[in-house]
């Protein structure tokens, strides 16, 4: 197995462990690295854990490293292939480096963007961190969901059209950002009573506290024409990027079988994905690729079942959240993304803004200059900033692709090559008890433990389809997700109300890798107990009965469940 040795990271892990040793004896270990020596047990059957469960990513997708920095590790598949290893390291640079306006090789930032680097949203390669404001800096993995609510307080409704689905709060000079991030307000409020009636004190007297965000953006923050009206805002934090190549390798027939299994026992499923009358997948459950591509055998593929993101918007990793985000978060164009991620309302506002026009009229080298007249600059700005303009082929200015196909290929080797750290402390009887409780409470109905990957004949776009990517065929993996959407019915819930079950693998190492362990889609849960109790906020939650069972556990058993979650 792959094991990166880094003395500085090991020292940091040691210092963290020393600090954590001051915790009360009855607190569960929070490091995720465990209190029980497990080296002699790794790869062996222990208690109610099989030998395979030590390797959540299978033998091809698991790293033995469980120290700080392990989220960055490549899989054994990459380690064993010199060309993939080199591409992985080059792709890692694409993820970690800041993009700029015009400095090669990481150029092309803007004109409107969310962050200047991928790692800003994925600190330590993990989940974003909870924020009390909206800085566009490292650690803030929040994306804004700005939408027209169907009713007062509703989580549902169409996105506003004036800004992009992932609204941008930064812009390259001389432009203004579509949303002025300095005017965004995030207020964290405390739940005073559970809608379900569950007390906020466990039967043994221990209390818990739940918080949720209220986000406001004044109309003055929008640099668009027109400005939006009648809108609400929700937060969505980034998901960790580790192990996504393994998820991509799960056969779609297996995921369809999971839908059918849940439908057969009466689970309410999102009608956008499951046609109850036909007892089959809905038409909108299928993703039609935005660019031409083939599977790894060179066969064309027209559509695939959606499996990635909270909202289940993407199907293949190679046209998935990362492949798309490295474009639309930065607005760095490439051969398969020749358009800007913008809106007509922003383009119009910029073409009418006096400071923008004056700056461009004073700079004959600007691609928006035209003949230098006000009318010409206005015309150039509007047309070149519109989302429908092919940046490489248009009558106004032919830009060049800002990310090369080789860079994109390296990025996808890195993305598909990220490993999952091995499980820890499965020999600990508390962890074994935690698994027993997890299963008996019904948590595994949604957090399905085990899947088996298929042949892994992955899809990829034509611009990189002739180059090999890491493959994970026929691996027994343990992501702890059913990859189906469910409703938790929380206060100020996720936009759209439905949320794909988040994989639990490796999350116990979040504190060691990112410095935070916030959970749930908007980081509202500061620890595992809060995350579980949010599942029981409403009796309409599809996980209410599991959360209610957790509520009734003794303090010792609750701690065992937490230790289990941190071990897997």
Where are these predicted regions, by residue range?
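N-terminal cofactor/phosphate-binding cores enriched in small/glycine residues
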Residues: 92
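Short secondary-structure subsegments characteristic of cysteine-rich extracellular domains
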Residues: 13, 17, 435-438
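Short, conserved catalytic or interaction motifs in soluble domains
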Residues: 25
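Electron-transfer interface patches adjacent to heme c in soluble/periplasmic c-type cytochromes
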Residues: 28-89, 99-412, 416-429, 435-568
